[in-house]
A protein has these predicted regions:
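Hydrophobic targeting/anchoring helices
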Residues: 310-316, 324, 432, 441, ...
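A conserved amphipathic helix/loop scaffold
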Residues: 747-925
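Catalytic domains of carbohydrate-active enzymes, especially glycoside hydrolases
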Residues: 354-401, 426-429, 545-550, 603-614, ...
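Polysaccharide-binding and catalytic clefts of secreted carbohydrate-active enzymes
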Residues: 339, 416-568, 572, 732
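Aromatic-lined substrate-binding rim segments of carbohydrate-active enzymes
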Residues: 373-423, 497, 501-512
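Extracytoplasmic
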Residues: 26-315, 327-329, 335-338
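Bacterial N-terminal signal peptides
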Residues: 9-19
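N-terminal carbohydrate-binding accessory modules
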Residues: 315-380
Length: 925
């Protein structure tokens, strides 16, 4: 058990709250699990983890024993009761451990009674209250850039004096002011520890407050029959851990009292503390000299009267303890082999299997299964339909070898290839250069790099004027932080140097392995803004042929983004590979708990249709062999989706092989100028109205609202039944791509200085330009530049902002409006950014509440140029999202919005409505 500031566990009571003997050190602790409270009416209910705000196989959201006590956001005066035993008289602090995604209230009252008298009461869950959180210590609201790990523990500083003996804990719902969230109470803790601390609090040895205290007294009893010829103990091993950061496997032997005689049953032994029941626990059994299967039984009580299943399994095999077995009576222990064989049978006889049972032939399906030497593991992988990395005699692609272990440089590549046989080289397909990596940087202080930079500037024809008056010979890499023009070109030089590194590494891979090998590096989409990576890394490297395969991932269920973000992600991928037609390798993550089966099905089917050549499910099973990414055995629907999606795609494969995604006539700009400058722009958190209320938020943060606006515009157009492409400023300025499009959408406060003139000529020729979320007031060097304003028919735009960060599912539902736009008879709340427009020859279409222009259009030649002085895409999405806390995984994950304010939808789609684009197909909702 990890160390802490002070060891708390001396005596703990859980479940039925049987008293435990007081320890000789530390504090006295009582843990009252939420699922063991008795609701006195209909307001409270025992709630499974999947129906709470946190259901995951990793991170910092954990419900001990897979459940909690839940109540709707609007309930009041509902009561639930649990009887406990106080082990020793003392002053106890009363903690509530509950789920608290930021920005919402979760009000509930705890009362403690002894001898029929109320001795304690306190209201918990008020927004802005100081609490202890996963990973971060104390804060009022929790702020993490990737979203949130939202387990909170809260207690008043004042302790209550309790006598040894019986007590009653009462949970009561109270009036819950807006914005109000559902109350999910994991457990209540009473402890004589006076400090704000818990087991593993520092240095963050656990990912959830007080969870180790609760796990230490879990109650799951097992016994076994010794079928060996000698007295023996049963060895129990967990192959790995799942509860972050406790990933190491563990071993124990039972019973502790001594070996069991041959032919006899052991006494009942509580293995609950050995298990970590925030997840299913797989346990490998070993009994020296066992004659046949080892018989084991489980129960919920020490007497073995409340049975919870029985198994017989060979030495070295695994039985599974479901995480909710302590309270969910239908749950029983089971063997991994039996469960795998059941899923295999369902795949072969019960689930839809299209294409006559023939696997895909050209689209590769990857998914890691450990222990393929076990016949039942290989049989399951084959039955699900995977066509890579299977042992004989199962059908799989002839060229499917992969290195997911990564070769980051030539030396690692050579060492890896040296270990391959000729046959393995011939069958090798996918080489990884890294997981969730950046492309790295040059050695900025290297004199050789300075000389190379000077030559690069001259070769590109960069003039002193372009460098702000600095001659190319005098432009120094060391000045990149003080001269924004030199900095822009220095960064571009750095990028191209790194492209060359990976281009060479790709060539070496092909030379060492063979021409069939493709190279890539998985890009994590979880940095800010999520699913909008640096343009040079996500687009330009593929234009420069730095890698021969695009590799990306789908963890949308784990972050506060709308589900259709996967469409944006793959549009980004296609933007990157359109130059050189690289293969696309895409992680579609099935991990359960976490990913909903219906979302997974959409992603599994959508990905091949969006151009993906390799669908990779990362880690699948057996779940007890993986740390934090897997499909738990109980998620039958997830396994079914994997099987049916693979075979559904196999039937459509003849239409997909060699095909490309039909291009659209509508585009959204991926602006490198905005991307570069927003990443450099550090906003004090006090200027972000929501971040300002989060103590643990960083003092400054990069602005992301321009890039998020591009994403939300994309989704608004997608909802309008349009095929939408993503294009770059280089596409416009250097490749003259505008002729392929009827409508272009631009978002952000920066735009490449080469682009406005191209846009003006295109609009005059009939194109429709739509600009929002900043109107390109600055060029890529962060200099005020009126060129785009002139195209829009504006003299200026007075800009105000109250948000730096928008993670749509988290901030948009609660963000205070920065203004209101009157538009076509409707009133549209604006979020994040407000620009009062000053037209020259543009017509006003919408106004702010003070009458100043907010929306304009300029007729220019045969085309039109629209300007919207706010984040129109974000305003649109805000009207469709439910006002609810962000649920990380599980059944409460937000569905794709389908109902939006008509005026907000019209505002977001002014451009495409001005020039109707004929689409070959439409979809219903």
């Amino acid at each position: 058990m990890p160390t802490s500031i002070r060891t708390l566990t001396a005596s703990v009571v859980i479940g039925a709250c049987l008293a435990a003997a007081a320890g000789t050190r530390g504090a006295d602790v009582v843990v009252a699990e939420g699922e063991f409270f008795q609701p006195q009416g209909k307001g409270w209910a025992v709630t499974p983890m999947d129906d709470s705000y946190g259901s995951h196989s990793y991170g910092g959201m954990w419900l001990t024993q897979g459940g909690c006590l839940g109540a709707a956001a609007d309930t009041k005066d509902e009561v639930a009761v649990q009887k406990v035993t106080i082990p020793a008289a003392g002053a106890y602090r009363v903690w509530s451990k509950y789920q608290a995604p930021p920005y919402f209230n979760y009000l509930h009252r705890i009362e403690v009674l002894q001898n029929g008298k109320k001795v304690f009461e306190h209201v918990y869950g008020k927004k802005g209250t100081d609490r202890l959180w996963s990973f971060t210590g104390e804060s009022d609201e929790l702020w993490w850039f990737w979203g949130v790990d939202h387990d909170a523990a809260e207690a008043p500083k004042t302790a209550v004096q309790l006598a040894a003996g019986p007590a009653e804990i009462r949970l009561i719902t109270v009036a819950n002011p807006a914005p109000a969230g559902k109350r999910f109470i994991d457990f209540v803790v009473l402890t004589t520890e006076p400090a704000d601390t818990y087991e593993g609090f520092k240095p963050y040895g656990t990912a959830s407050p007080f969870t180790l205290e609760a796990l230490a007294q879990s109650r799951v009893f097992v016994r076994f029959k010794n079928n060996s010829p000698a007295a023996a103990k049963l060895k129990l091993t967990t192959p790995v851990g799942h509860f972050q950061p406790n990933y190491a496997g563990r071993t124990t032997e039972i019973p502790e009292a001594g070996p069991v005689p041959p032919g006899q049953w052991s006494p009942w032994v509580n293995i609950g503390p050995f298990c970590r029941l925030v997840h299913d626990e797989g346990i490998v059994v070993s009994l020296p000299g066992a004659a046949g299967p080892i018989e084991s039984e489980a129960a919920r009580d020490a007497a073995g009267t409340d049975r919870a299943g029985a198994v017989g399994l060979p030495n070295g095999e695994t039985f599974v303890v479901p995480l909710d077995i302590a309270w969910n009576k239908p749950r029983k222990i089971f063997t991994s082999q039996a469960r795998a064989e059941e899923l295999t049978r369902l795949a072969k006889t019960g689930w839809r299997t299209r294409n006559g049972g023939r696997k895909p032939q050209s689209i590769l399906y990857y998914g890691l299964f450990y222990d393929l030497d076990r016949p039942w593991v290989a049989a399951l992988k084959d039955a699900l339909g995977y066509n890579t990395l299977l042992p004989a005699p199962y059908a799989h692609a002839a060229v499917d070898g992969s290195n997911h272990g990564h070769c980051h440089n030539p030396e690692e590549l050579k060492r890896y290839v040296a270990g391959l046989s000729d046959a393995q080289k011939k069958a090798f397909k996918v080489m990884s250069f890294g997981d969730e990596i950046s492309l790295g940087e040059i050695n900025w202080a290297d004199p050789a790099m300075q000389a190379k930079f000077t030559g690069w500037l001259k070769a590109r024809g960069v003039t002193a004027a372009a460098l702000g008056g600095v001659a190319p010979d005098a432009a120094k890499l060391a000045d990149r932080g003080t001269n924004r023009r030199v900095g822009w070109y220095a960064q571009t030089f750095n990028e191209e140097e790194r492209f060359g590194f990976y281009r060479d590494l790709t060539a070496q891979t092909r030379a060492l392995i063979g021409p069939q090998a493709v190279t890539g590096a998985n890009y994590s989409p979880h940095g800010m803004p999520m699913y909008y990576g640096p343009i040079h890394q996500w687009i330009d490297i593929f234009k420069h042929n730095g890698m021969s395969m695009y590799w990306a991932e789908d963890y949308v269920f784990s972050v506060p983004m709308p589900p259709q973000t996967i469409s944006w992600m793959l549009a980004t991928v296609r933007c990157g590979v359109k130059y050189n037609k690289q293969k696309i390798h895409f992680y579609v993550m099935p991990h359960a708990p976490g990913q909903r089966a219906d979302f997974l099905r959409r992603s599994m089917i959508y990905a091949p249709g969006a151009g993906v050549n390799h669908v990779d499910n990362f880690w699948v099973g057996p779940p007890e062999r993986h740390t934090e990414n897997f499909v738990a055995w109980g998620y039958t629907d997830t396994y079914r989706v994997l099987h049916e999606s693979i075979y559904d795609t196999a039937e459509a494969e003849p239409l997909l092989t060699g095909a490309t995604v039909r291009p659209g006539r509508v585009a959204v700009l991926l602006s490198k100028a905005t991307d570069h400058n927003e990443r450099l722009l550090q906003i004090p958190k006090a200027q972000d109205v929501l971040m300002a209320g989060c103590k643990n938020a960083p003092a400054t943060i990069q602005q992301i609202i321009g890039r998020v606006e591009a994403q939300m515009l994309y989704l608004a157009l997608l909802h309008g039944q349009h095929r939408v492409d993503l294009v770059t400023e280089d596409d416009i300025a250097a490749d003259n791509i505008l002729a392929k499009y009827d409508v272009l959408h631009v978002a952000g406060e920066w735009i490449d200085h080469r682009v406005p003139a191209k846009l003006e000529a295109w609009v005059k020729n009939g194109g429709v330009l739509y600009a929002s979320g900043g109107l390109g007031l600055f060029n890529e060097f962060n200099e005020a530049d009126p060129a785009l304003l002139k195209v829009l028919g504006l003299a200026s735009a007075e800009t105000k902002k109250n948000l730096a960060v928008i993670r749509p599912v988290m901030e948009l539902p609660v963000a205070p409006a920065i203004g209101e736009i009157a538009f076509e008879g409707g009133k549209i709340p604006a979020v994040g950014l407000k620009q009062a427009l000053v037209p020259t020859d543009a017509k006003v279409l919408g106004t702010w509440s003070d009458g100043k222009p907010a929306v304009t259009v300029r007729e220019l030649g045969k085309g039109k140029a629209f300007a919207v002085g706010t984040l129109a895409g974000c305003a649109y999405m805000r009207t469709g999202l439910p006002v609810q806390p962000f649920p990380r995984g599980g059944n409460l994950c937000p569905v794709t919005p389908t109902t939006f304010d008509p005026a907000a939808a019209r505002l977001a789609r002014l451009g495409v409505d001005a020039r109707p684009v004929e689409e070959p197909a439409v979809c219903d909702n």
